[in-house]
Amino acid sequence: MASSENAPFCVKFMKCGENSEYFLKGYEAMKQIQSDESLQLTEEREALVLKEKDKCVYICDPFSGAAFSHLKKLGCRIVGPQVVIFCMESQRRVPRAEYPVYNMAMADVTISCTSLDKETREDVHHYVQIMGGCVYRDLNVSVTHLIAGEVGSNKYLVAASLEKPILLPSWVKELWEKSNQRIIRYSDVNMTEYLCPIFRGCTICVTGLSSLDRKEVQRLTALHGGEYTGQLKMNESTHLIVQEAKGQKYECARKWIVHCISVQWFFDSIEKGFCQDETMYKIEPASTIKSVPDTSTPTGGNSKPNSRTLYDVSQISNISTSCVNESAFNSAMASRLDPPADTLENLDISSLQAPDDLLDGCRIYLCGFGGRKLDKLRKLINNGGGVRFNQLTGDVTHIIVGETDEELKQFLNKTQHRPYVLTVKWLLDSFAKGHLQPEEIYFHSSYQQTEMPSPFEPAINLTANKMSSTRDPLNHTRNHQADEDLLSQYTENNSTLIEDEHPKTSNTNSISQITCSEDLTTCTSQSGLADPSTIIEGGLFSRKQFMVLGFLEEDEACIIDIRKKSAGKVLSSQKRAIADYAVVPLLGCEVESTVGEVVTNAWLGMCIEQEKLLDPHSNALFTPVPFLEGSTPLRECVLSVSQFMGAERDSLVYLAGLLGAKVQEFFVRKANPKKGMFARSHLDLKDAEGSKYEAAKKWNLPAVTMNWLLQCARTGKKADEDSYLVDNVPEEDKDESFINQTYKPQAIRLSMHAPCHLENHPEALTKAAVTPLDMNRFKSKACQSVISQHNKNPQTSGGESKVLQREPSLHLDTPSKFLSKDKLFKPSFDVKDALAALETPGGPNQKNRTQSTPLSEVIGRNLQLAIANSTRQTAAVTASPQLKAAEKKEFDNSKLLINVVICVSKKLIKKQGELNGIAASLGAEYRWCFDESVTHFIYHGRQNDMSREYKSVKERSGIYIVSEHWLFACSEQQKRVPEALYPHTYNPKMSLDISAVKMGSYTASKFSADTSLQQDENSELQLQQNNKFGETSDDQVKKAAGDGNPQNPSKDVKGALTQTLEMRENFQRQLQEFMSATSVVKPRGSVGRAGFDNSPCTPEGARSTRNGRSRVLEALRQSRQAMTDLNTEPSQNEQIIWDDPTAREERAKLVSNLQWPDSPSQYSEQLQHNMNDAGGNYTPAKESLTDTEIAELEACEFEPKSAMRTPVIENNLQSPTKPDHLTPTPQAPSIAFPLANPPVAPQPREKPVQPFSKEETLKERRFQLSSLDPQERIDYSQLIEELGGVVIEKQCFDPSCTHIVVGHPLRNEKYLASMAAGKWVLHRSYLEACRAAKRFIQEEDYEWGSMSILSAVTNINPQQRMLAEAAMRWRKKLQGIKQNMGIAEGAFSGWKVILNVDQTKEPGFKRLLQSGGAKVFAGHSSPLFKEASHLFADFSKLKPDEPRVNVAEAAAQGVNCLKPEYIADYLMKELPPPMNNYCLPDAIPYVRVTGTGLSRKRKTSGDVSDVKRSRHY
């Protein structure tokens, strides 16, 4: 074909059977103006052969089909016939668009989109472009129409102001549908029907409007496309129309970021025809109205103006707020006592602003009210601080009656103490006048008036006190509390404790925190509150008194309002009563009055959010934060706060802003000036989790706790981030408060100032909770002198050393409780810890002294037996308690892993914080990402792990790849244990450590500096090394274990344990020599026994002997340790075995013949390393093998011998042996090592003769596991190895496997490849049956697809059942072919395949096809088409720059061009599925013409048998 540059321009009309009438009209019109040379009528087949873009214009109708898709992919210029007709009629050029244009319905239209989801926006763009329009992402002057999904965006407001049409996406779809029917313009469709409604996407709620206005708003909202809701809903409501800036809806709307706008916004939007900008109609909270006029009368600097705004209780809407004289006000209110009949129904509760303690001491029962009236009365009682009862009891003081009730009359006739029975006017008038009104003038006429009996006299006195002074209604405390108020002025700030709120002490929980202990009648009255039959209703802060200090007027009014809604009481700063809480700003202020706790507004906000009373010491933000004024240490930091919400988050953002930091919501790595985003430098969060935390780790940005911010505020300097990383916070310290630190620089402005300031009493901050023993509370000279002599530190050091360990409050009484004038004060102190501190400290020589008593000797003997019979945790018992104590004093734990740099694998990301913390505590460093400085990589996985992370680390030399248990062992044993004992395959449930004693000696000798300790260790080491070679008799063991020293039972323990180690080492030595005899390497000079007899007994010598031994022996320690009987005499280890040189040579030949060149198992790899390291030069990281390797090793060395030379083995087991020439034996004699309950199953050679044929017995069973839980994998892997099988640990299918055990049939690579290769696909019950039989059994009954399995497993779907049946069908078919024809075939034998799929999936497809006997070509060039039989391609998953096969050319040459789904369906279905259903689109024309390509090609091939053809068709 000619080059596209030289090809002439022409117009090609693509002819097909589905052309419309416009196609012919366009062609006829073009013939009139174009020559025959430049106008062509072509077929689709000609377009499919086109390989590159040319200069021609292609006229297609419709825009579908293979030819259209091919041309579009090449980027050719494609238009529809309507475009040709329109351009000719209007004398316009055909558009040169980069995309196909079907018609010109939207010519001259430029659109932009806003508030659309991604899918809808892409559809709009597609339709506009295909109709000849233009699309802009941004809104500019050229845009003619805006397509909007809803109103309110910036694009919407600008377009509306520019009077551009704002339309819905349905307008574009309507144009497309009509343009397919006839040639139209966009103006032919009425746009008014598709204009975006004014309130589209708005969910409107109202508050404060009349019912008529509400209905009108509801009607107009629905008319203009909005949604009206009566309830304000979070994440649903978008606008709240408010009359005034108050009310519950308004507060919630502000919190939920809902637009709070006036009703004018609503009507202006309708009038102007588009939704107005909400910022122009925003309703802000009104400032507090001053109700007291400015006068010349001095009122005192600290006195607050009376904040009560006086309202009438009638329905008059315009209430005068002008201030009048108070006495005149009282008389004016008295003249309007009688409200209208429906006053209570229409009463606005918010207009009654009375003192919060107005009803203090009143216990009220409401009778005869319901509906809205009852709700309003409840709110009034709660706001006034009263206690409301739900049922009549003897504790009720006031009964407010609406309608008469017979039960009330009966109660009044029976009760001895009759309460006041009043009308509702008493309550309304009391609120209107600001103080309680006398009850006598409000008695209900239906009930007889009686006097209150004596138990209620305190309440009468309280009422009288309130009536006596109307100018100060808040000053109404009882007279007998004056002494306690006076005393409380001299107590230390913050020393008053919060009382226990447990029901048992509810008699002390009075409405204020001060109780009158001597007033028995009041206590009797209050005790009734604890009656379980009485239900008391109150808010969150019920019975709590507050003092608000240090806020602006607006903030203070807001806080007071919150208190009212939660039934709290706010005291004035001049009131002498002790408030429960003083609420101050976050940075604190001066608190002159005595209060129970000083808390911040953050505490208040979080209590409201969580709807419970929080402990002020549970969070550092709940108490004032020390702050160095004028310091901005974080001015160059950009902070992101995550995982904090509500008031806690606001407080942290506020504090960070004060420190100079920039706080932004999004956590980005690079700055984006257009969006106003800065590159983050710090992340502040609670826990080490979440997407932002992962990003911080990935970008190496510090993720710190909020304590870092507090430290920066405290010191005025930027604190070190490493000390406050969220990963370093222990679990038990995550909830600890940070407020109990006593270090306060003098330059810091303290947040609280008491009469005794903190600079003179640094322990004041630690007394929020009284601990059982606080050294600072012992003020006597005698105690202080003793303590100072003992500590040799200043007095405050003891208090400062324990401030971080905050102890729970004991809820003790304050001096105002127990310092009564008529009672004798008898203090009691808990001084047990103080007396213990006065004991004489132990001297340096006392650490090894023990007392010998008969009981201790009995314990010592029992301890020896327990240790000798234990096979676990030997490292924990080999070191005596004295040695452990000495190590703790001598060694510094922070230097155990010095010069070690760890990096934790991504697989252990959940444990990363914990592991990094352990490493840091042991002196190691850690890295978030693997780099050049890492020395230890913490990983957990299989031996031949296929993960990229493991491979990349393994390629690096000198890196220890260890298990997480290595760190745990170092921390537990307080020493650096060898890395070889904890490879990344280490499993504590399957690994038993017996070499910890040697390593303990090595570590102790390396680090110990104590002379006596060194001698002790050297003697122990000498004993252990002698025991290695079985040269120590019983007498020597007893002598070495400390004979004649009954006062040191630890030496006896060592002696008993040494016997155990002696037997184990002898057995290991025998196995080592057995393996050495079967190794094809030169003998090592350092392994002989003669070389050890005179060697120095040093730790280095012990280690070198280990390095010189076989690595297989080091691995066998795990599976052989449990076989040792620790009660056996040492002499029984001296075995006499006949040495057969011929047998040893034959075994050596057998080992060399059993090397599997095709096996991917761990054994061949590890054995090769072992041969390369024959000289003993290998690192400790390679000292250990996994259990799978051990099983493969034994399968290599033991199984053939058990089958071929069974009589020889039996003879060896029964014949005497000589100790100098040990013949390798597969297992030690049962006399020396009886297997009582071994954790590891016996080897297959010990089993009776299997009921298999000789061929089946010699056949090796190689298993792969799939779709099993991790614990099942571990369990079944161990079982297979115990039974003599081999487990292949690969993520993908291994052709060398013979069986695959599957949890559930899945359509994955392992299952399909096993099916294609005819392997045994078994249910897990097969392994359980083998476990019960202790051998491998026949497989037929446990195969997936067998009736026994399918009938037992009922929870499988049809696809899984089809997979199960297909596995058995292919296994029988392929095994039958092998038996009948002697040919090993697969399901795909004879296939020659070309693959063109995603590169990440191509290896899996290749392995699957090859497992079934197919030949897969590398690449997909054209010459391969002649030889190939199948082509599988998936272009949808290919990247644009990846090469693609020419499907049309391949199909033309008879290659079956199919989708990859055909492979799995071919295996699963009983009959091969029709290829036409899986044919690629570009190959369909050739399938119709030539038929099935495979049939034609295979008929001409002579190398394919009829049997293969019959399987394919």
Swiss-Prot record:
Sorted alphabetically, the Gene Ontology cellular component annotations on this record are: centrosome; chromosome; cytoplasm; nucleus; site of double-strand break; spindle pole
Biological process terms from the Gene Ontology for this record are:
chromosome organization; DNA amplification; DNA damage response; DNA replication checkpoint signaling; DNA replication initiation; double-strand break repair via alternative nonhomologous end joining; double-strand break repair via homologous recombination; mitotic DNA replication checkpoint signaling
Where is the motif named Nuclear localization signal mapped on this chain? 844-850, 1508-1511
Q: Can you tell me where the transmembrane regions are? A: none
The residues forming a coiled coil are none
Ranges annotated as biased composition (Polar residues) = 786-799
Phosphoserine sites (modified residues): S1131
Subcellular localization is given as: Nucleus; Chromosome; Cytoplasm, Cytoskeleton, Microtubule organizing center, Centrosome; Cytoplasm, Cytoskeleton, Spindle pole
UniProt cross-references to SUPFAM superfamilies, sorted A to Z: BRCT domain, Uteroglobin-like
Q: Where is the BRCT domain?
A: 101-189, 194-283, 354-444, 538-611, 629-726, 892-984, 1253-1344, 1383-1480
Top-level taxon of origin: Eukaryota
Name the Pfam families for this protein.
BRCT, BRCT_TopB1_SLF1, PTCB-BRCT, TopBP1_BRCT0
Q: Name one GO molecular function term.
A: DNA binding
Keyword annotations from UniProtKB, A to Z: Cell cycle, Chromosome, Cytoplasm, Cytoskeleton, DNA damage, DNA repair, DNA replication, DNA-binding, Nucleus, Phosphoprotein, Repeat
Q: What is its main location?
A: nucleus
Entry comment, domain topic: Some BRCT domains specifically recognize and bind phosphoserine/phosphothreonine marks on proteins. The N-terminal half is sufficient for DNA replication.
| Protein name (record) | DNA topoisomerase 2-binding protein 1-B
